[in-house]
Amino acid sequence: MREEDTVCVGSDGLQYCKVCGEAKEAFFPKCGFMGMKKHSRQCVCDRKAYEEEQKYFKDKEHWELVSRNTSICFDESRMEEWTFENADMSDAVMHKAKSYVDNWEEMKRNHIGCLFWGPVGTGKSFIAGCIANELLKHEVTVKMTNFNTTIDDIFPLADKTEYINALASYQLLIIDDLGVERNSEYALGIIFSVIDRRIRSGRPLIITTNLPLNEIKSETVLDKKRIYDRILEMCTPMYVGGASKREAIASMKMEKAKTLLNTNKGEECE
């Protein structure tokens, strides 16, 4: 729509918006300014359009930042689907995970982390991923990784301290599957350095592991014991039990495959 179609001139000589009826011009006080008697001003429509434009660019900047941080956080794109929206929120541990996010500022201020432990396949990584994705939406920097990846990344580096400091710099660090990595003296040394530096940074840490909590607490091997002691110093243990979700998913896929394959004539799948 052309501007002349939305503007009219009032009896006072000022331009008015035909839509909202508010003046689009105003008189300078007294003698004017540099020979001009009036100046432009925003009407209600102009102000609304400006606010919408500002919101658009602010939202665009926000989601671009979230997208960048998300790509840094996860090594696999499928983890971006690990969200509370896709979770069973009637689950007690999942509810606690959501509460952790809802109280993030207090958790961060008090350096409170979590240790999700329990049998294989019960959804510990998924829970940690839900926390990560929800915080990422609020522009919190998160890194979710595991020690096998960390050790492989660090091994060829001349300056290992820089890498470890980078892990410590994220507002939240999530270490997935503690205990599946190599148990060499070198590996345990790297693990301790990462955990120790993280704790000294004062920033929260979340760990997932298949190791039983009593095994973690009663570890006698010195190199492992000092790692576990540091973790328990910061992370609140939460048991994640129940049936294996991986087995349930595999069973569901098997039944789906049988249904699809048996639609064709011939020998049925067993």
What are these regions (language model features)?
Residues 1-94, 249-270:
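A short, basic N-terminal segment
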Residues 23, 134-138, 197:
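Active-site catalytic microenvironments for nucleophilic, acid-base chemistry
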Residues 90-112:
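A short, well-structured juxtamembrane/interface segment
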Residues 94-101, 117, 132-172, 182-189:
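Short glycine-rich substrate-engagement loop in P-loop NTPases that contacts/grips substrate
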Residues 108-128:
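Walker A/P-loop nucleotide-binding motif
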Residues 172-174, 206:
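Structural motif
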Residues 177-178:
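Walker B catalytic acidic pair
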